C-alpha cells in the first residue's frame, strides 16, 4: 500500500478499479472475489490496482491481506483525472440493494468469524462514490472502461479476463497497410 504503483505498467495490462471508502462492504466483497482468483488474473498478464477515496492508514485494516496494489486517494485526484463520480444513486438505485444486503451480511460474518473490523460509521470521502473500471495498455491507452451506475455495478473477474483476452487479440491482429 505504501509502495510505488506504476500505471501504466510497461510489462502488463493494468486493471485500474475505483472503489468507494475503506471498509465499504460492497467494495470489500468485490475485492475478495478478485483476491480469490488472483492467480488467474496474474496468469492472464494483468496487474490489479484498486483505488479508494480513503487514506492508506484508513485502508490498512481492511485491505492489508489483499494480494494486489491498493492505493489511497483521499483528495480524489485520480477520481477527478478519470472522471469517476459520486452520486446518491450509488445507494438509492434499487439494482444495488441486493448487493448491499449480501455484502453487509458477508461483512457481519467476517466480523464475527474472522475478527475483521466493522465498516466506519462516518467514512472518509463519504458513502456515495460510484465504481469504475479501466483496462490500461502498457503504452497508457485505455483499452476498455466502465463507469458503474450504482455501488454494486462493476466488472467481475470473468468480465476482466474476457476484456483482457479481447484486447490482446485486437492488438495481435495485423494492421492493414492500405
Identify the residue ranges that each predicted region occupies.
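A short loop-to-beta-strand scaffold at the N-terminal edge of the catalytic core in hydrolase folds
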Residues: 1-5
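Short active-site neighborhood of thiol/selenol oxidoreductases, capturing the structured segment around
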Residues: 6-36, 48
Amino acid at each position: 500500500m505504501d509502495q510505488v504503483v506504476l500505471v501504466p505498467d510497461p510489462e502488463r495490462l493494468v486493471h485500474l478499479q475505483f472503489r468507494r471508502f475503506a471498509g465499504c462492504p460492497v467494495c470489500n466483497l468485490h475485492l475478495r472475489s478478485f483476491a480469490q482468483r488472483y492467480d488467474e488474473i496474474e496468469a492472464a498478464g494483468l496487474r490489479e490496482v484498486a483505488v479508494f477515496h480513503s487514506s492508506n492508514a484508513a485502508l490498512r485494516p481492511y485491505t492489508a491481506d489483499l494480494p494486489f496494489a491498493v492505493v489511497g486517494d483521499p483528495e480524489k485526484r485520480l477520481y477527478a483525472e478519470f472522471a469517476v463520480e459520486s452520486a446518491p444513486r450509488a445507494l438509492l438505485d434499487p439494482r444495488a440493494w441486493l448487493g448491499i444486503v449480501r455484502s453487509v451480511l458477508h461483512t457481519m460474518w467476517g466480523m464475527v468469524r474472522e475478527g475483521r473490523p466493522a465498516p466506519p460509521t462516518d467514512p472518509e470521502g463519504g458513502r456515495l462514490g460510484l465504481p469504475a473500471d479501466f483496462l490500461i495498455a502498457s503504452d497508457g491507452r485505455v483499452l476498455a472502461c466502465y463507469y458503474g451506475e450504482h455501488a454494486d455495478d462493476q466488472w467481475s473477474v470473468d468480465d476482466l479476463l474476457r476484456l483482457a483476452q479481447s484486447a490482446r487479440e485486437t492488438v495481435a491482429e495485423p494492421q492493414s497497410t492500405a
